Design a protein with these regions (language model features):
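Terminal connector regions
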Residues: 17-58
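Short Pro-Gly-centered flexible turn/kink motifs
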Residues: 3-19
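Low-complexity, Ser/Thr/Pro/Gly-enriched N-terminal "stalk/linker" regions
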Residues: 41-122
Length: 244
């Protein structure tokens, strides 16, 4: 569509996806759009705590949730192929096989994942994702639970129990918030639906034990609880080098 939009004016384009031809495809367009708007308003009005918010707070709350939903993205990254190179392209430098992410050959990303931002940060980060899942549990608890399970699957979680941190360096260390997020999502879902998804807890528990064992053995062998309070530091800049 080529449209000339004058200053202070708007233009509207209606499209419809259908398996069959319609003689009047947009006959009920205004009614359908209005109905969907009403349904969306009713859904967001039913969310936990909305009744205690001001109108401005409800608007901010809804826009924030919309931003989270908008930040779902298909993410495809085969680490092994990146390390070895594509057969149809020039081979990468040998140093790549000894550099960052060289220990993550098992990692196969081919999923819809919640991103920090699909424009500025179009890659997942394990601890960002854990935080995303808590508000997502209000609007799509099944997706929130599936995201937490995804990072614990055998093609994501390292055999030693480490969660993949983020694309630039999957071996980086982020605060251990995955178990906390799983419990929070479980409780939010239980409060919303009236039933607790214990199967979800069972699915994540064993893998979280592996992750906890990695923390204890690799990051705190002296038993100093170094990954508790203060681990993050300021704006993801720790007071010590947490990758060593």
């Amino acid at each position: 569509y080529i449209l000339d939009v004058a200053s202070g004016t708007t233009q509207t384009v209606l499209t419809r996806l259908s398996r069959q031809q319609h003689a009047t495809p947009f006959e009920a367009a205004e009614r359908v759009v209005a109905q969907r708007q009403t349904e969306a308003d009713e859904f967001y009005a039913s969310l936990l705590g909305v009744d205690r918010m001001s109108e401005d707070q409800r608007r901010i709350h809804r826009q924030a949730l919309a931003g989270l939903l908008w930040s779902k993205q298909f993410y495809h990254f085969e680490v092994e192929e990146w390390l070895d190179g594509d057969a149809a392209a020039p081979a990468p430098p040998e140093s790549r096989k000894r550099g960052r992410n060289a220990d993550w050959r098992h990692l196969h990303n081919l999923d819809i994942v919640s991103m920090p931002d699909t424009w500025e940060y179009p890659w997942y980060a394990a601890w960002d994702l854990a935080f995303h899942c808590i508000p997502l549990a209000l609007v799509d608890p099944d997706f929130a639970k599936a995201q937490l399970v995804l990072l614990l699957r055998e093609w994501y979680l390292h055999p030693n129990g480490q969660l993949p941190a983020y694309e630039w360096n999957f071996s980086a260390v982020n605060p251990p918030v995955h178990a906390w997020a799983a419990l929070r999502v479980f409780r939010i879902d239980r409060k919303r639906t009236g039933r607790g998804d214990t199967l979800f807890l069972k699915r994540v528990f064993h893998k979280l034990l592996l992750n906890f064992t990695w923390w204890v053995n690799r990051k705190d062998p002296e038993g100093n609880n170094i990954f508790e309070g203060g681990f993050l530091g300021l704006d993801n800049i720790g007071v010590f080098d947490r990758s060593k």
